[in-house]
């Protein structure tokens, strides 16, 4: 276990740190158990578990922040619960109820309060809920038994080129993140295993990650590594890609609301052609892990596109989002879940 006293909260990075407790529920005979907290972080699975052979696994990611008053605040956990249900349906897995999901997350945060990052430290407590197919199995078919688990770890910035570091650099990849009508729109494990080679190739060239284009024409932006993309045009419009193979980002949905209702910007969710990049003065990667990471350069077909990093609007959105997540500013209804 990591030494809590020696944690450098301002330079944590994004990696696994064993905390004290995690939540586990089991699915057998057609229903989920009540579940509960355990201290052991090792799992014992049958060698026939479908998760090991056929990738029957889906997961979520959300964060808890410490408010100025010391309260633990979860950001839009109900949206994560709904997205996990969609992912479960796609892989023929039993849905985790919203009640079970919220209770599990709350119990994990309460049991690991000492790992909750200090207020305004730049860090947070990241929660990883996931569902896996387990039990004795050999053929390609859904599991009969499942585990729903939530663990947590204190984390810092996902990309090194964060909001205070001058932005990140990305290059387009020849690989597709997802197939048309595939699993790109859900958060399943196989999508991320397939991304490892593209990520490795990008980082070996000195970039922070790769940019995936649409799998049909390879002319439109889809995702930025494991995050969503947005751009700010020269006339101050917030534009973000739309495609059924893009994971519906909760952070992106939130930024669209903030850009429109708080900053009075024009907001569009539509296809974005690579040829349009010159129309953007700012660009960013957004997601639970990335929060908002400004993009300073995108390379495509040996051509570089440069952006303000961070630009004025990107910084305003970042500050606004963080102030809501940390309880400094009143949030839209149902965005903040206070853990008692």
Swiss-Prot record:
- The kind of enzyme this is, by top-level EC class, is transferase
The pathway that the record names for this protein is: Amino-acid biosynthesis; L-isoleucine biosynthesis; L-isoleucine from 2-oxobutanoate: step 4/4; Amino-acid biosynthesis; L-leucine biosynthesis; L-leucine from 3-methyl-2-oxobutanoate: step 4/4; Amino-acid biosynthesis; L-valine biosynthesis; L-valine from pyruvate: step 4/4
Record key words, sorted = Amino-acid biosynthesis, Aminotransferase, Branched-chain amino acid biosynthesis, Pyridoxal phosphate, Transferase
Task: Give me the reactions it catalyses.
Answer: L-leucine + 2-oxoglutarate = 4-methyl-2-oxopentanoate + L-glutamate; L-isoleucine + 2-oxoglutarate = (S)-3-methyl-2-oxopentanoate + L-glutamate; L-valine + 2-oxoglutarate = 3-methyl-2-oxobutanoate + L-glutamate
Which Pfam families does the record cross-reference, listed alphabetically?
A: Aminotran_4
Positions of modified residues (N6-(pyridoxal phosphate)lysine): 187
- Cofactors named for this entry: pyridoxal 5'-phosphate
Query: Mind listing the GO molecular function terms for this protein?
Result: branched-chain-amino-acid transaminase activity; L-isoleucine-2-oxoglutarate transaminase activity; L-leucine-2-oxoglutarate transaminase activity; L-valine-2-oxoglutarate transaminase activity
Q: Which GO terms describe its biological process?
A: isoleucine biosynthetic process; L-leucine biosynthetic process; L-valine biosynthetic process
- InterPro entries attached to this UniProt entry: Aminotrans_IV, Aminotrans_IV_CS, Aminotransferase-like, B_amino_transII, BCAT-like_C, BCAT-like_N, BCAT_family
Enzyme Commission designation: 2.6.1.42
**Gene3D superfamilies xref list:** 3.30.470.10, D-amino Acid Aminotransferase, subunit A, domain 2
Q: Which family does it belong to?
A: Belongs to the class-IV pyridoxal-phosphate-dependent aminotransferase family.
Function description? Acts on leucine, isoleucine and valine.
By what name is this protein known?
Branched-chain-amino-acid aminotransferase
Q: What is the lineage of its organism?
A: Bacteria, Pseudomonadati, Campylobacterota, Epsilonproteobacteria, Campylobacterales
